[in-house]
């Protein structure tokens, strides 16, 4: 007598994967399982539920296994699925770029609120292009420029700008170096700001997969503010704004840098968790 082959229905794969990913330390294992299996099977999440009792064929099972194995090694879901939503737009993401965070939407909101008529905008450290593209979409008459040192990130930012029909001019280089005598009404930046010693304690998704050059802000995390804040006035038109994203506990020190550099109307803005996430100021 031959044994009956085991039948893996969608329900059974979902249940097994949810437990497996939770065991591997994945938060939100239930939701992530649904996204992974949806991607592997080419279904939306409702499609999974209405096909609960459908047995999977060997190819479908192999596709599920491949994606689940990657997530079990703590590769970020966004790199596996290839996209992340930001400001209502879908961005292609690869390991060349930091995955856009929802907290970063605060700098976009502040920029649009305080500088709605900016005609020339600069984003330093453009990464996936999320801030630059979101601003270009909301300020269609503005010239938006992005600077980035990573060639892989520049290529992806270009792809994301084209995907959304956003006019963003990209320069490869460090900070203000590629800009010559251009001047801006608004400069935004989400620079690397994690203190070097804290990198090892980050979640494996961040520590092992996201680009270190997007995270490491030097010994106290403030290296990039020390470079950007004093240099910015030379690249701002009169009345122009500088706004930077920052990490927990950095606002007071960065505000001090703004005041000492001569910025006025300085402000801090909080993320949805009440953490000071953005500092900004205007040049007189
Ligand atoms: C924290 S990530 C932000 C990416 C994107 N703007 C976002 O908000 O998701 C910082 C970015 O700055 C880039 N970067 C690091 N050093 C740089 C430098 N000296 N000049 C320009 N870009 C730099 C990194 O490659 C990375 O893409």
Swiss-Prot record:
Enzyme class: transferase
Record's function text: Methylates the class 1 translation termination release factors RF1/PrfA and RF2/PrfB on the glutamine residue of the universally conserved GGQ motif.
Keyword Repeat: no
Swiss-Prot/TrEMBL keywords: Methyltransferase, S-adenosyl-L-methionine, Transferase
One GO BP annotation of this record: methylation
Family as reported in the entry's similarity comment: Belongs to the protein N5-glutamine methyltransferase family. PrmC subfamily.
PANTHER family registered for this protein in UniProt: HEMK METHYLTRANSFERASE, MTRF1L RELEASE FACTOR GLUTAMINE METHYLTRANSFERASE
Family annotation (CDD domains): AdoMet_MTases
HAMAP family associated with the record: RF_methyltr_PrmC
GO molecular function: nucleic acid binding; protein-(glutamine-N5) methyltransferase activity; protein-glutamine N-methyltransferase activity
Domain of life: Bacteria
EC number: 2.1.1.297
Name of the featured protein: Release factor glutamine methyltransferase
Reactions listed under catalytic activity: L-glutaminyl-[peptide chain release factor] + S-adenosyl-L-methionine = N(5)-methyl-L-glutaminyl-[peptide chain release factor] + S-adenosyl-L-homocysteine + H(+)
UniProt gene name: prmC
Binding site for substrate: 190-193
Gene source species: Geobacter sulfurreducens (strain ATCC 51573 / DSM 12127 / PCA)
Residues annotated for S-adenosyl-L-methionine binding in this entry: 125-129, 148, 190
Pfam families on file: MTS, PrmC_N
Keyword check for Methyltransferase: yes
